From Swiss-Prot:
PROSITE patterns: RIBOSOMAL_S7. This is Small ribosomal subunit protein uS7. It comes from Hyphomonas neptunium (strain ATCC 15444). PANTHER family: RIBOSOMAL PROTEIN S7 (PTHR11205). InterPro entries: Ribosomal_uS7, Ribosomal_uS7_bac/org-type, Ribosomal_uS7_CS, Ribosomal_uS7_dom, Ribosomal_uS7_dom_sf. Gene3D superfamilies: Ribosomal protein S7 domain (1.10.455.10).
Length: 156
């Protein structure tokens, strides 16, 4: 990793259907092997399923799910005199969003419905109601941070 120059942030364009940048970021996370059109079909298909099942605006459900999954604190390893401590630190806004997107996509992939759009729709609806594996991941992360509160003074 270069110490001189950090890579500049690329601008993410809003998605064509909902004009939402976060939906595009989610699509990019779902995308495999550069197949954006496949990812687009999966995400929009999942949103259609959410709309028919939940009778709500799918983008609102998506944003609620992200909010329910985004962690406030996480633990980072810090080495102090031969011992490694798990130090709880607050999560920056950008990283919160990135982690929430990543965890939602991973939790959806781990479900056992037939198609990815069904898995995604199920996970989005579960997460927006405070259930599902992505929310469990957030709670586990918070629990770890809480358990290691004693090492908070090692923060950097």
């Amino acid at each position: 990793m270069s110490r001189r120059h950090s890579a500049e942030k690329r601008e993410v364009l809003p998605d064509p259907k909902f004009k939402d940048i976060i939906v595009t970021k989610f699509m990019n996370q779902i995308m495999r092997d550069g197949k954006k059109s496949v990812a687009e079909r999966i995400v929009y298909g999942a949103f259609d399923l959410v709309e028919t099942r939940a009778k709500k605006n799918p983008v609102e459900v998506f944003h609620n799910a992200l909010e329910a999954v985004a962690p406030a604190v996480e633990v980072r390893s810090r080495r102090v005199g031969g011992a490694t401590y798990q130090v709880p630190v607050e999560v920056r806004t950008e990283r919160r969003q990135a982690l929430a997107i990543r965890w939602l996509a991973a939790a959806a992939a781990g479900r056992n419905e037939n198609t990815m759009r069904e898995r995604l729709a199920g996970e989005l609806m579960d997460a927006s109601q405070g259930r599902g594996n992505a929310v469990k991941k957030r709670e586990d992360t918070h629990r770890m941070a809480d358990a290691n509160k004693a090492f908070a003074h090692y923060r950097w």
